[in-house]
Amino acid sequence: MQPIPDVNQRIARISAHLHPPKYQMEESSVLRRANCRAKGGAPGFKVAILGAAGGIGQPLAMLMKMNPLVSVLHLYDVVNAPGVTADISHMDTGAVVRGFLGQQQLERALTGMDLVVIPAGVPRKPGMTRDDLFKINAGIVKTLCEGIAKCCPTAIVNLISNPVNSTVPIAAEVFKKAGTYDPKRLLGVTMLDVVRANTFVAEVLGLDPRDVNVPVVGGHAGVTILPLLSQVKPPSSFTQEEINYLTDRIQNGGTEVVEAKAGAGSATLSMAYAAVKFADACLRGLRGDAGVVECAFVSSQVTELPFFATKVRLGRNGIDEVYSLGPLNEYERIGLEKAKKELAGSIEKGVSFIRG
């Protein structure tokens, strides 16, 4: 017969498994560190996702947890962060996951981060104009960037929150006010335009999308999205009908998804995929890998506009080089002028939001 204390201890252990305590955000971590033998995952980079419980944030967080370059993954949101954190933390990959809930935990979420990815904000819905989107998301981006300026001013920032053509200038102005602005470290994520372009062009050419690369320049909305089909790799020729079709579909890919979801959301899954693809490129650049080149909306002197999406080479300091547009055909030159006209107003709108 077992001693009474041993029996009681055994019952307590079984009861703890059958009735686990309600999950709480303790010390901004899934587990108290004192209860864990391991203090961290494999060597790698510290990444924060701001807006991790949203439609983009959740699949983005899951995919980032799978990235072997990530050692610590901080998930921040104003709602539902505990549940997302608990769920993703059960994945048997190297990154240690910690969750942060609400404005009061933003600073802890950001401290010491190497890369900050921002999908926070409201999604686009049918009938919603870019102005509607701007009014809500501009304030969110401002608040989050103020936290970055204070807690991790040297982090690379990947900004997804729309409208990117305006939110990137907002972020730049916030960082300038704080005295922490480094144009090499602020990148608007336009990778979804490239991903769509690769997919749609591959369909027309009958190729595997993974073997296709289409530079997409300009901005990240409507006519500001300019696919350079004359520079497609592998080199390809298109009829004018194909050029018109591809350009229109790439520019309106977001609307295609919004309408297909019929009010149930926007492009969340493909956006998360594109965001992780771009974040991985940034991490490979930070690691020192050579030849990491992607398109992004960045501070630029390629045109007369202060921001523009072009190919950039990524390195240990963020952007190592911003590439020129290269040779354009007549169709692309006309598209470029349309893009610049639209883009100028969007950039000014973002700047004015901070400067007043």
Swiss-Prot record:
GO terms classed as biological process: glyoxylate cycle; malate metabolic process; tricarboxylic acid cycle
Top-level taxon of the source organism: Eukaryota
Record's subcellular location: Glyoxysome
The keyword Transit peptide appears for this protein: yes
Chain positions recorded as substrate binding sites: R124, R130, N162, R196
Active site: residue positions: H220
Annotated organelle transit peptide span: 1-36
UniProt GO MF annotations: L-malate dehydrogenase (NAD+) activity
InterPro entries cross-referenced by the UniProt entry: L-lactate/malate_DH, Lactate/malate_DH_C, Lactate/malate_DH_N, Lactate_DH/Glyco_Ohase_4_C, Malate_DH_AS, Malate_DH_type1, NAD(P)-bd_dom_sf
EC number: 1.1.1.37
The keyword Oxidoreductase is assigned to this record: yes
Chain residues that bind NAD(+): G51, A52, A53, G54, G55, I56, G57, D77, N137, I160, S161, N162, M271
Keywords carried by this UniProt record: Glyoxylate bypass, Glyoxysome, NAD, Oxidoreductase, Peroxisome, Transit peptide, Tricarboxylic acid cycle
Catalysed reaction equations from the record: (S)-malate + NAD(+) = oxaloacetate + NADH + H(+)
Gene Ontology cellular component annotations, sorted alphabetically: glyoxysome
Family under the similarity heading: Belongs to the LDH/MDH superfamily. MDH type 1 family.
Subunit composition and interactions: Homodimer.
NCBIfam families to which the protein is assigned, alphabetical: MDH_euk_gproteo (TIGR01772)
UniProt protein name: Malate dehydrogenase, glyoxysomal
Source organism per UniProt: Cucumis sativus
